[in-house]
From Swiss-Prot:
One of its GO terms (cellular component) is cytosol. This is UPF0246 protein VFMJ11_2214. Belongs to the UPF0246 family. InterPro entries: YaaA. It comes from Aliivibrio fischeri (strain MJ11). It holds the Pfam family H2O2_YaaD. GO terms for biological process: response to hydroperoxide. The lineage of its organism: Bacteria, Pseudomonadati, Pseudomonadota, Gammaproteobacteria, Vibrionales.
Length: 259
């Protein structure tokens, strides 16, 4: 069973690491090509393209300039411990055991606008480049065109290596659009998390992101190997709703929070 999640905008390069192990990303030469395109942008260009503040634009202009094709423990850190957003709050990687980190290294992948696909222990230099960014590049006018089938092909290799035919999609729509379902040699299962608000159950972004991380953690800690076992997910009060689920979409609900 292979899990894919989105990256996070917020990064953490300060917290002590729970492991000294690391690996190298698979698409460094492709990332270097994107960095080359990014280096042609001024901070003003970046602010406009990425819809970010001048401060964030300036920071990322510096990051693009400082980015190197040599990844070391001095200029990078393992991706799983570098991302710090709602998904990663739920995943809480720093509290995973060594054996759980090893399991994640085989079964968890992070989609990325700059790096394509990251393994948990892949060294990652800091960046901001969301998958939906309309960055002109040598392969097209956006990152979906840039990555083409590369991410899907890599996922197929990973699935074949572990003898799995199931991909659990815990990524956002923006990121999962970088995967080509028709070319993927696996069944895609997408968990959907609905929270009750004012008597209605709906997907609330903040809660759903954290729930995706909780589900990833649940799979890693319990070494889940089939879809049936996913249905027993009950972290933070979520419960499986058979009546609203299908073979490819698993619906989980939770009662209203902060009453």
């Amino acid at each position: 069973m292979l899990i894919v999640v989105s990256p996070a905008k917020t990064l953490d390069y300060e917290t002590p690491l729970p492991t000294s192990a690391f690996t190298q990303p698979d698409f460094i030469s492709d990332s270097a090509e994107l960095i080359k395109a990014c280096r042609t942008l001024t901070p003003v260009d970046i602010a406009k393209l990425m819809k970010v503040s001048d401060k964030i634009a300036s920071l990322n202009a510096v990051r693009f300039e400082e980015w190197s094709t040599t990844f070391t423990q001095e200029n990078a850190r393992p991706a799983l411990f570098a991302f710090k957003g709602d998904v990663y709050t739920g995943l809480d990687a720093n509290s995973l055991s060594e054996s759980e980190i090893e399991y994640a290294q085989t079964n968890l992948r992070m989609l990325s606008g700059l790096y394509g696909l990251l393994k948990p222990l892949d060294l990652m230099q800091p960046y901001r480049l969301e998958m939906g960014t309309k960055l002109e590049n040598g392969r097209g006018s956006n990152l979906y065109q840039f990555w083409g089938s590369l991410i899907t092909n890599k996922l197929n290799q990973e699935l074949e290596a572990q003898g799995s035919e199931t991909l659990v999609n815990l990524a956002s729509n923006e990121y999962f659009k970088s995967v080509k379902p028709k070319e993927l040699k696996a069944d895609i299962v997408t968990p959907v998390f609905k929270d009750c608000k004012n008597g209605q159950y709906k997907v609330i972004s903040f809660y759903a992101k954290k729930a995706r991380g909780l589900m990833a953690r649940f799979i890693i800690q319990n070494k889940i190997s089939n879809v049936e076992e996913l249905k027993s997910f009950d972290s933070d009060g979520y419960y499986f709703v058979e009546a609203e689920s299908t073979a490819t979409t698993l619906v989980f609900k939770r009662e209203e929070q902060n009453k």
